[in-house]
């Protein structure tokens, strides 16, 4: 039996307005090579100037993961040649990063586990190579975008743990608002270092790096395939020949990893301090940066103060947008439990395909108006589902207007309900006698008949109250 050893390197693009060492914009999707300047293009004499906002965002992350913030950190040149790297070196941090020795807690199968974070360092992103129609093109818009590279300890033992760690990290980054962490646009990318060893062995064996994984599903599939490949090689006696220190790519069509190139050692990059950048010396006020409430803290508050289930709170804190939507709901002085049900179950049931909580046709104010009408007895919970479906398709219609159009306003007038109940009881005298002789289950029959006659417009609570009084 084997133990899996996984360490993850996450590159997250910081959401600063300008690049890390120049004033070019970081906006995504612009025409190729328009967000560039002499610094981005590595023209002679162009000097880098560090973006203060990038430093602040790195510090905020460090505080969120209980890490040490180094008051002095150094930028280094990482030397390698690639077409999308015009300087032929990347400005990064090596031996003295801005953040180190952090931690993050995950829960897998009901068990809590601490995962160490070795370091988080600032660096610049490279440009982008585009290969099409037998041509290779280079777009340098992305070159110089600030990155925070977050390196975990090799303490993850399965693909499930790796995905749980990444989801937790992704959530923290979003709640800190230091990155949009959009995996499809490449602002949250992961490299996975995977190796195996016999259970009980503490030695670290040959690791393989899988590059640029950009979805949680592909991360899980890539790790699972690589573990299977290495395990089979060990069992077949071909481990030393087939498992070498290398960089592999994940084939998302066939769900396999493929060799890309040999894995470089740190010495091959010839790191040395960048002579154009002074060491970063942090003043005390930088270390006092306030960070917002984090997902786990929100979850605990929702459970303790609002009395909702932990499982429901987990769904709410699953994204920053979901959390904001929920807090907007409860700010309207509504029942927290009703808010949870109508957000987590009813509204989310409508959000499919391209629709997310962020672009939901029904916003928090409109859903809150619907919940108010349930609370004040204007409509029943069952009728409210029809109203939600209607306003979901007819986005310009307000809740009260939808209730009127659909004719779903509840009747709470005692005399109107009593008249229908009298009619039903008189028409079912035999069942009334059976009920009074002990067949309590017939109460549901009387409720159903009354609601049917009332065309679902009767207030169920009133129906129950009057029926109980009539039947004795």
Curated annotation (Swiss-Prot):
Enzyme Commission no: 6.3.5.-
An annotated Gene Ontology molecular function: glutaminyl-tRNA synthase (glutamine-hydrolyzing) activity
GO biological process, one term: glutaminyl-tRNAGln biosynthesis via transamidation
Keywords (A to Z) from UniProt: ATP-binding, Ligase, Nucleotide-binding, Protein biosynthesis
Reactions this protein catalyses: L-glutamyl-tRNA(Gln) + L-glutamine + ATP + H2O = L-glutaminyl-tRNA(Gln) + L-glutamate + ADP + phosphate + H(+); L-aspartyl-tRNA(Asn) + L-glutamine + ATP + H2O = L-asparaginyl-tRNA(Asn) + L-glutamate + ADP + phosphate + 2 H(+)
Superkingdom assignment: Bacteria
InterPro entries according to UniProt: Asn/Gln-tRNA_amidoTrfase_suB/E, Asn/Gln-tRNA_Trfase_suB/E_cat, Asn/Gln_amidotransferase, Asn/Gln_tRNA_amidoTrase-B-like, GatB, GatB_C_1, GatB_Yqey_C_2, Gln-tRNA_amidoTrfase_suB_CS
Enzymatic class: ligase
Subunit: Heterotrimer of A, B and C subunits.
Family label: Belongs to the GatB/GatE family. GatB subfamily.
Function: Allows the formation of correctly charged Asn-tRNA(Asn) or Gln-tRNA(Gln) through the transamidation of misacylated Asp-tRNA(Asn) or Glu-tRNA(Gln) in organisms which lack either or both of asparaginyl-tRNA or glutaminyl-tRNA synthetases. The reaction takes place in the presence of glutamine and ATP through an activated phospho-Asp-tRNA(Asn) or phospho-Glu-tRNA(Gln).
Protein name: Aspartyl/glutamyl-tRNA(Asn/Gln) amidotransferase subunit B
Originating organism: Campylobacter jejuni subsp. doylei (strain ATCC BAA-1458 / RM4099 / 269.97)
Gene assigned in the entry: gatB
């Amino acid at each position: 039996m084997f133990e899996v050893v996984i360490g993850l390197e996450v590159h997250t693009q910081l959401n600063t307005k300008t690049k890390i060492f120049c004033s070019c914009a970081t906006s995504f999707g612009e025409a190729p090579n328009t967000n560039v300047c002499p610094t981005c293009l590595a023209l002679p004499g162009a000097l880098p100037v560090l973006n203060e906002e990038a430093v602040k965002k790195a510090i905020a992350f460090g505080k969120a993961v209980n890490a040490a913030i180094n008051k002095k950190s150094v930028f280094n040149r990482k030397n390698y040649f690639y077409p999308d790297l015009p300087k032929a070196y990347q400005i990064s941090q090596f031996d003295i990063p801005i953040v180190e020795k952090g931690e993050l807690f995950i829960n897998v199968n009901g068990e809590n586990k601490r995962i160490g974070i070795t370091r988080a360092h600032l660096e610049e992103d490279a440009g982008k190579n585009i290969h099409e129609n037998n041509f290779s093109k280079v777009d340098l818009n992305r070159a110089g975008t600030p990155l925070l590279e977050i390196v975990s300890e090799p303490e993850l033992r399965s693909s499930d743990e790796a995905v749980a760690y990444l989801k937790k990290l992704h959530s923290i980054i979003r709640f800190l608002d230091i990155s949009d962490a959009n995996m499809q646009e490449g602002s949250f990318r992961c490299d996975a270092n995977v190796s195996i060893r016999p259970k009980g062995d503490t030695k670290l064996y040959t690791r393989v790096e899988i590059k640029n994984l950009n979805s949680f599903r592909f991360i899980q599939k890539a790790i699972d395939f690589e573990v299977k490949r290495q395990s089979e090689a060990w069992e077949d006696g071909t481990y030393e020949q087939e498992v070498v220190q290398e960089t592999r790519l994940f084939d998302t069509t066939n769900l396999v990893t493929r060799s890309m190139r040999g894995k470089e050692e740190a010495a091959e990059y010839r790191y040395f301090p960048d002579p154009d950048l002074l060491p970063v010396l942090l003043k005390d006020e930088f270390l006092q940066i306030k960070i917002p409430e984090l997902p786990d803290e929100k979850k605990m508050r929702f459970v303790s103060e609002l009395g909702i289930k932990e499982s429901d709170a987990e769904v709410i804190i699953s994204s920053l947008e979901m959390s904001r939507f929920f807090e907007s709901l409860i700010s309207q002085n509504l029942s927290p439990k009703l808010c949870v049900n109508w957000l987590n179950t009813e509204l989310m049931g409508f959000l499919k395909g391209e629709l997310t909580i962020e672009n939901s046709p029904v916003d928090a104010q409109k859903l809150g108006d619907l919940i108010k009408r349930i609370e004040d007895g204007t409509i029943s919970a069952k009728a409210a589902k029809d109203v939600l479906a209607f306003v979901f398709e007819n986005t310009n219609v307000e809740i009260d207007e939808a209730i009127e159009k659909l004719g779903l306003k509840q009747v709470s007038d005692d005399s109107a309900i009593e008249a229908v109940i009298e009619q039903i009881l008189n028409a079912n005298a035999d069942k009334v006698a059976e009920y009074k002789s002990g067949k309590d289950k017939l109460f549901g029959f009387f409720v159903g008949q009354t609601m049917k006659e009332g065309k679902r417009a009767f207030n169920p609570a009133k129906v129950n109250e009057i029926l109980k009084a009539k039947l004795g």
